Curated annotation (Swiss-Prot):
One of its GO terms (biological process) is intracellular transport of virus. The chain crosses the membrane at residues 194-214. This is Envelope protein US9 homolog. It is a single-pass type II membrane protein. Essential for the anterograde spread of the infection throughout the host nervous system. Together with the gE/gI heterodimer, US9 is involved in the sorting and transport of viral structural components toward axon tips. Belongs to the alphaherpesvirinae envelope protein US9 family. It is found in: Virion membrane; Host Golgi apparatus membrane; Host smooth endoplasmic reticulum membrane; Host cell membrane. Residues 153-168 are annotated as: Acidic. It comes from Equine herpesvirus 1 (strain Kentucky A). It comes from the Viruses. Its main location: virion. Phosphorylated on serines within the acidic cluster. Phosphorylation determines whether endocytosed viral US9 traffics to the trans-Golgi network or recycles to the cell membrane. Pfam families: Herpes_US9. Keywords: Host cell membrane, Host endoplasmic reticulum, Host Golgi apparatus, Host membrane, Membrane, Phosphoprotein, Signal-anchor, Transmembrane, Transmembrane helix, Viral envelope protein, Virion.
C-alpha cells in the first residue's frame, strides 16, 4: 500500500509573522512579500487538501499518519488523525477515558497487600543494622558528620560549624553559631584584660625595685 506524504516546507519569517519587516525594506516591498506569503499559504492549503484526498482514496488507515486541515467539524482549526478530529474545543472519540476511582483504589489495595511480603523478604537483622549504623560521609575533602558525643571534641577554632541535629532549622543554627562566637569573643576579652592587669602589676613591681635600688646607691 502506497503512503501519501507531504513534503516539508520551511515557512519564511515574513509569512509566519506578517508584521515582520526586514532591515532596509520599503512599504512596497513589505506589501509584495505579504502578498507572496498569502499566495504561498493558499498553495500550501491546496496541497494539504490534495494530500488528504489522496490518503482517503488510497485507503490509508494508519492513525499515526496525520494531515493538517483548515477547520475541524466544530469550526476550529485542528488536525485530522484517521477518522478522529482534534480541535481546540473538540475531543477524539477514540481517546481512552481516565481510570475510575474504583480501579485506583484497587491498585492501592494491591500495593498495600504486598507490604507484608516485602517486609518478610528483607531480614530483620539487616534492617536493624542499617538503622543502628552511624551516619557517615564519604571522605571527599569535607569533614564527616559528628554525633552528639563527638561534637564536644570538635575543634571549634577552625571556624567550621555543622548542624548537630537533622531537625535543626536555619534560624536555630544561626543562633547557636552566634552564641558560640559570642562566648569565644568574651573569653578573648577576659584573657586580654587579665594579661593587661598582670603586665601593669609587673611593671609597677619592676619600677619599685629599680627605685629602691637607686635610692640605696644614691642616698
Amino acid at each position: 500500500m502506497e503512503k501519501a506524504e507531504a513534503a516539508a516546507v520551511v515557512i519564511p519569517l515574513s509569512v509566519s509573522n506578517p508584521s515582520y519587516r526586514g532591515s532596509g525594506m520599503s512599504d512596497q516591498e513589505v506589501s509584495e512579500e505579504q502578498s507572496a506569503g498569502d499566495a504561498w499559504v493558499s498553495a500550501a492549503m491546496a496541497a494539504a487538501e490534495a494530500v488528504a484526498a489522496a490518503a482517503t482514496s488510497t485507503g490509508i488507515d494508519n492513525t499515526n499518519d496525520y494531515t493538517y486541515t483548515a477547520a475541524s467539524e466544530n469550526g476550529d482549526p485542528g488536525f485530522t488523525l484517521g477518522d478522529n478530529t482534534y480541535g481546540p474545543n473538540g475531543a477524539a472519540s477514540g481517546c481512552p477515558s481516565p481510570p475510575s476511582p474504583e480501579v485506583v483504589g484497587l491498585e492501592m489495595v494491591v500495593v498495600s497487600s504486598l507490604a507484608p511480603e516485602i517486609a518478610a523478604a528483607v531480614p530483620a537483622d539487616t534492617i536493624s543494622a542499617s538503622a543502628a549504623a552511624p551516619a557517615t560521609r564519604v571522605d571527599d575533602g569535607n569533614a564527616p558528620l559528628l554525633g552528639p558525643g563527638q561534637a564536644q571534641d570538635y575543634d571549634s577554632e577552625s571556624g567550621c560549624y555543622y548542624s548537630e541535629s537533622d531537625n535543626e532549622t536555619a534560624s536555630m543554627f544561626i543562633r547557636r553559631v552566634g552564641r558560640r562566637q559570642a562566648r569565644r569573643h568574651r573569653r578573648r576579652r577576659v584573657a586580654l584584660t587579665v594579661a593587661g592587669v598582670i603586665l601593669v602589676v609587673v611593671l609597677c613591681a619592676i619600677s619599685g625595685i629599680v627605685g629602691a635600688f637607686l635610692a640605696r646607691v644614691f642616698p
